[in-house]
């Protein structure tokens, strides 16, 4: 009986007030009604037993079950409630005369619930009152419905009168418990039935899916077998299955003519000459085959049956359960003859297919949706296609004409050669050769495994003008693609994969393509523009509408392999994102694809080319690198000395300092920057000249001057007192100077020509005091670190180019001729103005027998703070004046010591940094014009009250090599990251408690950054260096 009450609701009334059952007083007390029990409850007679339960030990109260007696079964004190049961005709749980706890009959139990119809229970506030039949107005609740049937539940609701149970809170609770108990079983029963139904549906659907899968697997196996059989069949281009059908048709021809079975549905509209096969009677077959019909009709019928079954059955089988669980939809059956009337090629009756396990009957048709053949042309069903990987061509006797459904790719490679026609253009015109390999590439990717060509090329058949400039050539049709990934874009530059083999041939790609021819001879290393080119550098002609560089007629001839009609998009409608810096693009090709950017906003006629520059001379190939190890000087060619003549001393008129910059000098400066000379060599030479010119000699004489005086030219004249020098000495030194000056002019190390040197008097070497014992090994090592730079002499007179000099006359004493012949002094740079020269001087490739005849103080380079490398040197300029000792002559050891001191004053750390980060210099040189335009757009540089320059900021990626940041030390990156993170998160940072400082090295790096930030007035730093924060 206890199982019947397991699902009863639990009412918690542990918070009851007053009259609680005291277990200490009546722990095992027994109470009985009219018939006393023995502690377990009376079981006979009219009485009901009640056994008191202990609340602490969770005792249960067993009620008597005697005939007619009111049984009461107590529940767990803590977990369950009292469930009072009332038998008909008997009293409730409490006896009429006695109450529990003191005669008033108030059971103040905190948890019990009474099921009796008459006894009221106050669960939360009190117990049963000590009055018999307290709730006489309580009525019987209707019976619980046995099922969820609509009629039963409706009857239950009609019998339930809710108005009778709203008079007190106890009745409402009683009604709630009853309804929960009543409908809980109904809900569980309905849920179980739903789960059972869903399980059955899932099992049925799984069974149907398995059947469909098996059927489709069988169909795919048949199709695969037919395909495999057709791969090795070359007789008629069809498989063995069709041959077997042909054999069956020949054997059972009479059977096919008299076939009565309906095997395939036909549309309602039947063309003339065809038989209505839907009647199913013999009379409907009057228009069938006759004895004179040819067997080709049977063969064509077999073709139609196979293609319809394989194509339609496979496609509809995969949609079997997508639409109406595989059932046939009447509206899904198209009228094939109405849409594609040419597909219905069956004249006569159809027949069964022995390849399948079943006949094509009405049952088979109803299980599939009939769809039209998915081909653009019905003739494509019967075409035989060549396998791409097959080297041989299949023979088809049915249809000999092949179908090419893909556009063949045209592979083209062009090699530019110099035309035989003479160059008759004016000096203002430039060559139409455009270095496409360097000007039309993208900076973001490397050179792809292929080439880019123009569409204005040539074929081998027709000779038409190539462009408006009159360049003879031929047109070529390229594939409509600018990149390998965009096959439908408008062609501007066509991507050509690497199709050129080592023997210089290009394989034929299209069907029936022309045979390849060997490549044309390569271009010479130097042409009219002075651009260095090799055999792999592509040159294309420029159109007059596409660029402002107008070429002369007949300048170049561009040849190609295959071609067609020319395209319409101009060549220069594509603009690269960044100029290309590819030092060894001609040494190797990679397979990285190239991305081009098309400019839509600008018309082609407004497009101009970027400035041409000799990148090949700046970045030399590896095999042309010069060994910097110092060796013996090159032997000078023997020249015939002519008889020297005695010259009189001639005083030069002292003139003013170098004039200010004029428009002509500014033009010369721009030409020097934009000339075809060696830009990187000039930069390095200028750096070394600044370093060498700002060196303080070790002599005791020094002239202090201000910064403004340094900017003016200070020269030393070449005048020597004639009366103090014997004629023999003068003649000897003059001839020696002439020979040496000529040699220097050839090598580019000296700035004066031989003819000009002959007209100048001989100057004695300056005396520079120093220690005679010099470190020869250190001097040689310093010389070896200096890179050699090839240069060419200036063809103009120095005074005419750079203006007159200021005369400072020095009169040395008599020279020793024997020492003069044995001297070995590397010469100093002679005459340098602030204008960037076209000639570059270096100290590493000069001869040993040269005289320092002229010294000029070098001012700082005016690069608007873009030359980051030479900034430190120019800012720390010192006042220099040559030593003017006139007491003693300079010995060879003194001169070597002086030169050694000069070389050691050059910052070797800066030179090492430049050599390690050559890409930075290359990037700065390449983007000099762009960076200058950005800086000039921010406004001119003006000096503030302190005399410092106002600098502007720009992205560091434009002036720095990103690899410097990528290859940064991990510890430095961690310290910088932690430092800036602390500055952002905290208003004030304590260095003693900084988590990113682990050792002294971290603290050193952190304080270095802190001092830089403090100098830039970004942070505030305490006097002891412990606390810092953002301003």
Swiss-Prot record:
GO terms for cellular component: chromosome, centromeric region. Its main location: nucleus. The modification Phosphothreonine is found at residue 27. The modification Phosphoserine is found at residue 22. Residues 85-95, 328-342 have a biased composition (Basic and acidic residues). Residues 638-652 have a biased composition (Basic residues). Isoform solo and SMC1 function as partners in mediating sister chromatid and centromere cohesion in meiosis. Not required for sister chromatid arm cohesion or for mitotic chromatid segregation. This is Sister chromatid cohesion protein solo. It comes from Drosophila melanogaster. The lineage of its organism: Eukaryota, Metazoa, Ecdysozoa, Arthropoda, Hexapoda.
């Amino acid at each position: 009986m206890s199982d019947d009450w397991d699902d009863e609701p639990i009412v918690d009334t542990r918070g009851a007030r007053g009259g609680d059952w005291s277990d200490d007083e009546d722990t095992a007390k027994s109470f009985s009604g009219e018939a006393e029990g023995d502690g377990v409850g009376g079981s006979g007679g009219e009485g009901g037993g009640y056994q008191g339960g202990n609340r602490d030990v969770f005792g249960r109260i067993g009620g008597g079950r005697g005939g007619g007696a009111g049984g009461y079964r107590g529940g767990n004190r803590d977990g369950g409630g009292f469930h009072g049961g009332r038998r008909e005709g008997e009293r409730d749980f409490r006896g009429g005369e006695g109450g529990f706890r003191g005669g008033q009959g108030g059971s103040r139990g905190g948890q019990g619930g009474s099921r009796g119809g008459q006894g009221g229970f106050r669960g939360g506030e009190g117990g049963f009152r000590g009055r018999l039949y307290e709730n006489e107005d309580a009525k019987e609740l209707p019976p619980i419905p046995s099922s969820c049937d609509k009629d039963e539940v409706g009857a239950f609701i009609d019998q339930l009168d809710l108005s009778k149970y709203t008079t007190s809170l106890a009745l409402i609770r009683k009604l709630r418990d009853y309804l929960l108990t009543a409908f809980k079983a109904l809900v569980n029963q309905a849920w179980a039935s739903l789960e059972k139904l869903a399980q059955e549906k899932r099992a049925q659907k799984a069974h149907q899916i398995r059947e469909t899968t098996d059927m489709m697997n069988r169909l795919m196996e048949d199709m695969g077998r037919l395909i495999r059989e057709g791969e090795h069949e070359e007789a008629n281009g069809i498989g063995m299955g069709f041959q077997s059908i042909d054999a069956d048709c020949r054997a059972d021809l009479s059977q096919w003519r008299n076939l009565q079975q309906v095997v395939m549905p036909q549309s309602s509209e039947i063309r003339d000459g065809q038989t209505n096969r839907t009647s199913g009677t013999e009379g409907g077959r009057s228009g069938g085959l006759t004895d004179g019909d040819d067997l080709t009709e049977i063969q064509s019928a077999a073709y139609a049956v196979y293609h319809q079954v394989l194509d339609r059955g496979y496609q509809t089988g995969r949609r079997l359960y997508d639409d109406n669980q595989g059932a046939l939809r009447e509206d899904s059956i198209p009228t094939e003859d109405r849409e594609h009337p040419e597909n219905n090629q069956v004249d006569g009756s159809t027949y069964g297919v022995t390849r399948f396990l079943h006949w094509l009957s009405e049952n088979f048709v109803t299980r599939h949706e009939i769809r039209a053949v998915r081909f653009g042309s019905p003739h494509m069903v019967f075409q035989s296609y060549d396998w791409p990987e097959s080297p041989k061509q299949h023979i088809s006797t049915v249809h000999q004409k092949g179908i090419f459904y893909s556009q063949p790719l045209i592979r083209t490679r062009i090699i530019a050669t110099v035309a035989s026609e003479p160059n008759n253009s004016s000096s203002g015109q430039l060559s139409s050769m455009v270095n496409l390999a360097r000007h039309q590439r993208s900076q973001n990717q490397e050179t792809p495994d292929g080439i880019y060509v123009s569409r204005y090329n040539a074929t081998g058949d027709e000779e038409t003008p190539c462009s408006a400039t009159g360049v003879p050539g031929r047109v070529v049709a390229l594939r409509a693609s600018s990149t390998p990934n965009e096959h439908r874009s408008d062609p501007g530059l066509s991507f050509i994969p690497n199709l050129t083999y080592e023997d210089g041939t290009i394989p034929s790609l299209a069907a029936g393509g022309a045979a390849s021819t060997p490549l044309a001879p390569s271009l010479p290393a130097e042409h009219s523009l002075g651009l260095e080119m090799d055999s792999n550098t592509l040159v294309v002609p420029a159109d007059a509408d596409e660029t402002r560089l107008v070429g002369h007629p007949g300048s170049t001839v561009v040849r190609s392999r295959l071609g067609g009609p020319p395209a319409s998009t101009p060549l220069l409608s594509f603009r690269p994102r960044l100029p290309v810096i590819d030092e060894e693009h001609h040494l190797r090709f990679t397979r990285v694809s190239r991305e081009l950017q098309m400019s839509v906003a600008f018309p082609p006629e407004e497009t101009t080319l970027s400035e041409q520059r000799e990148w090949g001379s700046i970045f030399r190939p590896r095999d042309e690198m010069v060994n910097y190890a110092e060796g013996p000087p090159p032997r000078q060619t023997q020249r015939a000395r002519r008889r020297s003549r005695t010259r009189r001393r001639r005083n030069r008129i002292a003139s003013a300092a170098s004039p200010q910059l004029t428009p002509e000098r500014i033009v010369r400066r721009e030409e020097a920057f934009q000339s075809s000379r060696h830009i990187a060599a000039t930069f390095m030479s200028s750096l070394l000249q600044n370093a060498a010119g700002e060196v303080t000699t070790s002599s005791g004489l020094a002239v202090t001057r201000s910064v403004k005086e340094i900017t003016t030219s200070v020269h030393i004249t070449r005048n020597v007192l004639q009366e103090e020098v014997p004629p023999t000495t003068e003649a000897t030194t003059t001839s020696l100077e002439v020979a040496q000056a000529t040699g220097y002019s050839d090598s580019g190390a000296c700035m004066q020509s031989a003819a000009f040197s002959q007209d100048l008097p001989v100057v004695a070497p300056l005396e520079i005091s120093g220690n005679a014992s010099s470190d020869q090994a250190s001097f040689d090592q310093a010389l070896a670190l200096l890179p050699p730079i090839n240069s060419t002499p200036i063809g103009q007179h120095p005074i005419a180019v750079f203006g007159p000099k200021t005369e400072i006359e020095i009169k040395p004493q008599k020279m020793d001729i024997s020492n003069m012949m044995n001297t070995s002094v590397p010469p100093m740079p002679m005459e340098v103005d602030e204008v960037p020269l076209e000639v570059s001087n270096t100290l590493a490739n000069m001869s040993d027998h040269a005289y320092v005849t002229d010294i000029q103080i070098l001012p700082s380079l005016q690069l608007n703070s873009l030359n980051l490398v030479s900034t430190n040197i120019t800012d720390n300029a010192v006042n220099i004046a040559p030593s003017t000792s006139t007491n003693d002559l300079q010995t060879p050891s003194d001169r070597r010591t002086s030169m050694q001191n000069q070389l050691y004053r050059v910052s070797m750390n800066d030179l090492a940094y430049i050599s390690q980060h050559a890409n930075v210099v290359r990037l700065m040189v390449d983007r000099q014009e762009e960076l200058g335009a950005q800086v000039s757009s921010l406004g001119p540089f003006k000096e503030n009250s302190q005399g410092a320059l106002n600098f502007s900021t720009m992205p560091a990626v434009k002036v720095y090599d990103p690899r410097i940041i990528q290859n940064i030390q991990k510890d430095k990156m961690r310290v910088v990251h932690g430092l800036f993170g602390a500055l952002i998160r905290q208003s004030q940072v304590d260095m003693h408690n900084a988590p990113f400082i682990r050792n002294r090295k971290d603290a050193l790096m952190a304080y270095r950054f802190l001092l830089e930030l403090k100098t830039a007035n970004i942070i505030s730093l305490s006097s002891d260096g412990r606390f810092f924060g953002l301003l």
